[in-house]
Design a protein with these regions (language model features):
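C-terminal nucleotide
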Residues: 17-169
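Short, glycine/acidic-enriched loop or turn micro-motifs at the edges of active sites
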Residues: 14
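Acyl-CoA/ACP chain-elongation machinery
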Residues: 1-7, 144
Length: 169
């Protein structure tokens, strides 16, 4: 309802609540958030545009919402949950076999992993561990590419080029 189409809220939330030199740690269910200081101390950040088309009305977002809902429904056959984000990685490992749809399984694996990566990223930022934060961002990209399937060839090429510059596999 914020943007007039089915979409997430993060872009709009960041525009409304962002603060210089801070990351936003947002609970999309409750809209509770925390501003986490980001200390880059000599680190250069490159922001670029892939010029990839992005269409909120293409149905892909809604497909992923439905796939995640299917995963929740199937998990509910063995453990009651409302959201995938409720599951820790250990919890997910215990219930993942209930997800019989392979696509829904990959989407759920991404969501559960991304929630943990986000928690770990907040801790890394609070501790000033920018190397750990970068590793988590790289893991996030791989999961978005392989499990959530939303990156695209242009973004993948940029990530791979960056990884080569800093000697990552």
């Amino acid at each position: 309802e914020f943007a007039g189409v089915m979409c997430g809220i993060m872009d709009q939330f960041a525009s409304a609540h962002g603060k210089v030199d801070h990351a936003i740690y947002l609970n999309c269910d409750t809209l509770e958030y925390d501003l986490v200081p980001v200390k880059l101390d000599g680190i250069k950040v490159v922001v670029t545009n892939t010029h990839s088309p992005h269409k909120l009305d293409s149905g892909s977002f809604n497909d992923r919402v439905r796939q995640c809902q299917l995963a929740v429904e199937q998990i509910n056959s063995v453990r009651p949950i409302q959201y995938l984000a409720e599951l820790s990685q250990v919890d997910f490992d215990q219930v993942k076999d209930a997800i019989t749809d392979e696509t829904a399984h990959r989407r759920a694996r991404h969501v559960v992993g991304e929630v943990q990566r986000t928690k770990d990223a907040v801790e890394a930022l609070k501790n000033g561990d920018i190397v750990k934060f970068g590793q988590l961002m790289n893991q996030s990209h791989v999961s978005l590419r392989d499990d959530y399937e939303v990156t695209g060839p242009q973004l993948d090429a940029l990530a791979e080029a960056a990884w080569k510059i800093i000697n990552l596999p």
